[in-house]
Each structure stands twice: as C-alpha cells, then as structure tokens.
Amino acid sequence: MLIRAYSCMLLAILFWSLNPVANKIALEDIAVPQLVSMRAVFSSIILLIISYVIGYRYSPKKIGWKPFALGVLDPGLTSLIFVTALTVLSASNTVLILALMPFSQSILGRVVFKEDFRSSVWFGAVLAVFGLFIFFSGEQFFEADSLWGNGLMMICFCLFSVSQLLTRKIMRAEIPAIQVTSSQMISASVVLILYLIIFGDMELPLQASSGTLMTFVYLVFSMALPFFFYNQAMRHIPVGMASLFLVLIIPLGFLFAAILLGEDITWIKTAGAILVMIGVALPHLLESGKRKFSLMQK
C-alpha cells in the first residue's frame, strides 16, 4: 500500500514539475482568465466521467461540503494566482518557491495533527533561506514585475500550505479520492468562471496554434490527474513526508524549463537551488540516519 502511495506522489510531482513550463507556453496565446477557467471546467468533466466509468455514483450530499471548500482554495485560487505570477516570472522561479512546502508542513502538521516535529527542520530552513538568497541574487529581484510575481507566489505558497492540511484531514474520511478531486474541480470551476465573467474579456477570440492547443489539452489532464494522485497518496503518507517530495520539483522543473523554454539556468541559480534542495531534504535524511543507527544499536 505504501509503495502505491509513494508512486502516486511521484506521478503528481512529475505533472507539477512540467506545469509551469506548459502554462508559460499556453500563455503566449491564451489569456489568464480563459486559461484557468477552461482548464478547471474540462478537468471537472473528465473526472466526473472517470468516476462514472469506474462505478462511483456522484452524490454531493454524501461527499459533504469540505471537498468543495477545498476546491475553492486549491485549485481555484491557487491556480489563478500561480498562472498570473507566471506572466511576469520564469518557470524556474515558481518551482523553487513551491519546494519550500516541507517547512510550513512540518510546523502545521505538528500543530494540527500532532505529528512528530524534528528540530533539524530549523537547520534545514536556514540552509534553504540562504539558498533562496543566492538564487535571487542572480536576478533583478527588486524590479516591479519581480516583486509582484514573487509576492503572488508567496501568497500561493501560503494557500498551498493550508490546502495540504485540509486535504490530509478530508482524506482521513472514507470518501473515494476520485470524488474528492471531482468536487474540488467543480467548485474551482465555479470560482474561475465567475472570475472570467467579471474580470476577463468574454469577446476575446481564441487564436492559438496547434502546439498551444496540444499544450492546453495536457494542462487539462495535468490539472485533474495530479490532484487525484495526490489525494490518493495522502491517505497513507504523513503531511510532512508528503510535502518533502516537493523538493523533486526543483531539478525536474529546472530541466523542463531549460529544455522546453530555453531558460538560462546560471551557476548562481543552480548553486542556490542545490542549497534549497539540501535544506529541504536534510531533516528527513538526518531522521532516517538516526533511526537506522538506533536499530543497529539494538
């Protein structure tokens, strides 16, 4: 069961690593309101079809209101803020900030779920913050666009932190993961369609190349499937451990950004990213070493 849970988590990480790059490509031809709303609508339709095919009867009354509330937060608000930030930031910037999730999750997991808290998290946090400082020293951080984009990403980071805890709490109940994910997408669709109606240009024609349309098709599935994989994994993996996997977004995200977008990943940025990865992974590695040493002593 744990192997299946970790496999689901790795699949979710793979999708999330490629998403910033795919969003950057789609934004060349599709405006933010249209992109985020269409993704959510088509994703919810796909998930409802899958749920029906595999034999689940969708019943909002049985599911309850919590998955719908979670969907408003994530992927509703988070996808909107994330894609908006991508209009002014590079793809590599976004994956680095999101990889800091384990620190917030270790603290919040301890407060909410009474999960074990390792003091080594603080040492790892210092390394990660130092790595961020090095990373951002390689760009014009105090430019207006950079400040705006990174500010949005920090808001997105906070929303992701809260949503992970809510997901963990919801998935402790006996609700099928596919129905939780479908409910998330439905409520996210409502929020994002309202945003499109109020702030978007409804008369803006969709003139996208075949490559952009193929990217959009990928983005539809990559919005639905990672949340399903993630929700499935969260039944068996603690919050702190689950968020630790997000460190893999850094090397994968950098690789995709360099290959598909031609982003310049300088040595300064690489050094900063490596420090962040070490800082994020170090608490878990130290804890694993202590456990192995204790077993050897016995």
Model-derived features: positions:
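Specific transmembrane alpha-helical segments of multi-pass solute transporters/efflux pumps
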Residues: 15, 19-20, 51-98, 134, ...
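Glycine-/small-residue-enriched transmembrane alpha-helix faces in small-molecule transporters
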Residues: 1-34, 143-169, 190, 293-298
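Helix-helix packing/entry segments at the starts of transmembrane helices
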Residues: 36-38, 75, 79, 94-100, ...
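Hydrophobic/small/kink-forming positions within alpha-helical transmembrane segments
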Residues: 17, 21, 48, 72-76, ...
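Membrane-interface helix termini and inter-helical loops of multi-pass transporters
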Residues: 21-32, 87, 136-146, 197-211, ...
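C-terminal transmembrane-helix exit sites in multi-pass transporters
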Residues: 46-58, 82, 101-126, 251-270
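Hydrophobic alpha-helical transmembrane segments of multi-pass integral membrane proteins
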Residues: 3-8, 34-49, 69, 124-130, ...
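Hydrophobic transmembrane alpha-helices of multi-pass small-molecule transport proteins
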Residues: 47, 117-139, 192, 247-248, ...
